[in-house]
Amino acid sequence: MRAIIETVFDIFYLATVLTVGIRMIHGSKSGSQFKLFGLMAVVLGAGDSFHLVPRALALCTTGLENYAVPLGLGKWITSITMTVFYVLLYYVWRKRYQVEGQKNLTIAVYALSAVRVLLCMMPQNQWLTNKTSLTWGILRNVPFALLGLLIIVLFYRSAKDHSDKAFRWMWLTIVLSFGFYIPVVLWADVNPL
């Protein structure tokens, strides 16, 4: 029963996020923040599909333990697309608040992202096995968490400084996103569901 419910939910989620993202891209002006949000949705959905589709197949067939390689590859790809997602969110911030310059800030965003991707590429992560490394799970997420913290601070300060009611809680949505993500990193192998 769990396999069916989770699979139906995943199909609904992927179809929704990809459809909304594509519609936002096609319905927005070139270079607009809404086009960036659409691109973010497509990156998120496409990245998530690399681990949700193999997970659904595993749950509906022979089990997760028999799908170590496709599940690991999917988590690996998702880790990188999540990084791209936050780089795009940085550009939403720049566009929304008409930020010019800030070269050092942009360098920091790209440096943290590059370190994250580099750490994700290391074989010590053991992505393609049933037992990934908790230590490397933590290490590769340190630059990701710092990138997230940077984006949180940028949106918090800018929304406050510009009295931006529409984005006043954006920082909190990012905090919640990381709040839900951290337990997955720390305890996914303890209780893989």
Question: What is the role of each PLM region?
Answer:
Residues M1-L18, G137-N141:
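Hydrophobic transmembrane alpha-helical segments in integral membrane proteins
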Residues M1-T7, T19-G45:
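Membrane-proximal first intracellular loop
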Residues E6, L105-V109, N130-G148, M170, ...:
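A loop-to-helix transmembrane entry motif
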Residues G21-G27, F50-Y67, G72-I107, L118-Q124, ...:
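Internal transmembrane alpha-helix with an interfacial aromatic "cap," most often the third helix
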Residues S28-V43, E100-V109, H162-T173:
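Membrane-interfacial loop-to-transmembrane alpha-helix junctions, especially the N-terminal start
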Residues L44-G47, V115, P143-V153, K165-L186:
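Hydrophobic alpha-helical membrane segments
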Residues A111-G137:
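Membrane-helix boundary elements
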Residues N130, I182-L193:
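Extracellular/periplasmic helix-loop-helix junctions in multi-pass membrane proteins
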